[in-house]
Regions:
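Catalytic core segments in nucleotide and nucleic-acid processing enzymes
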Residues: 3-230
Length: 232
């Protein structure tokens, strides 16, 4: 556990490597790139692992690195398997909010069928804690419009018919990478808080938008945040 804590502390210094791994996934590269490669049969596990590392790099966590990840790692902190079903892939707890992260390599119209209900259920389960707000972050190489539409309708009903409004934001991996790179290239302070502000911005006004409009708005929200900050 102490070694994993040290591994976690090192991640902010490894942000460029983390970003390169994201790039490998985005482009589907099979060959070694800058000394890094993802075994083809391990892509789903590496996707979870890379995003876990990105959250450790963002830091400000209240829960331990081990509690954030739901997948098993080996002695070199490499992933062995993907997270089991029944829970979010990653759960990061910050001082004033909780972030449930779900990742998928599926891109077709099957994406919504495979991910829509489980992701919403996992976020709803965490919302029952009610101690701090819970946000969901859904990451895919490409977010299918029907998946975005499912998350746009945030309402979920528990078994006793009580409702909860789920705050789930779907980003493409490229959008998340752009945001991640910006946080570190510009040495942004309180990265976790900046992430929350951006998630809240993406959720604003979604009820009056169509799914394609919402996807476009989220892309522009990230782009504008980066452009505005870079021009200061």
């Amino acid at each position: 556990e102490q070694k994993e804590q040290q591994f976690a502390l090192d991640q902010a210094n490894k942000w460029q490597e983390i970003s390169q791994y994201m790039e490998i996934l985005i482009k589907g590269q099979k060959k070694e790139t800058n000394g890094l490669r993802i075994p083809s049969d391990m892509k789903p596990a590496y996707f979870e692992w890379i995003i876990w590392r990105s959250i450790l790099a963002i830091d400000s966590l209240v829960n331990s690195p081990e509690q954030v990840r739901k997948f098993k790692i080996d002695a070199d902190f490499l992933p062995i398997f993907t997270a089991p079903g029944g829970t979010a892939d990653l759960v990061a707890e910050f001082k004033d909010y909780r972030l449930a992260v779900e990742v998928t390599l599926s891109e077709s119209s099957r994406q919504e069928a495979m991910e829509g209900e489980p992701v919403r259920r996992h976020v709803a389960d965490l919302c029952q804690k009610r101690d701090i707000p819970t946000f969901g972050l859904f990451l895919a190489r490409k977010v299918h419009t029907n998946t975005a539409e499912t998350f746009r309708h945030g309402l979920w009903y528990y078994d006793d018919d009580s409702p909860v409004d789920l705050k789930i934001v779907p980003f493409s991996l490229e959008e998340f990478k752009n945001l991640f790179d910006w946080l570190f290239e510009n040495k942004i302070e309180n990265k976790a808080q900046k992430l929350r502000i951006l998630l809240e911005s993406c959720l604003q006004g979604k009820d009056s938008l169509t799914a394609p409009e919402w996807k476009k708005t989220m892309k522009e929200t990230i782009k504008n945040q980066i452009l505005v900050s870079n021009s200061l």
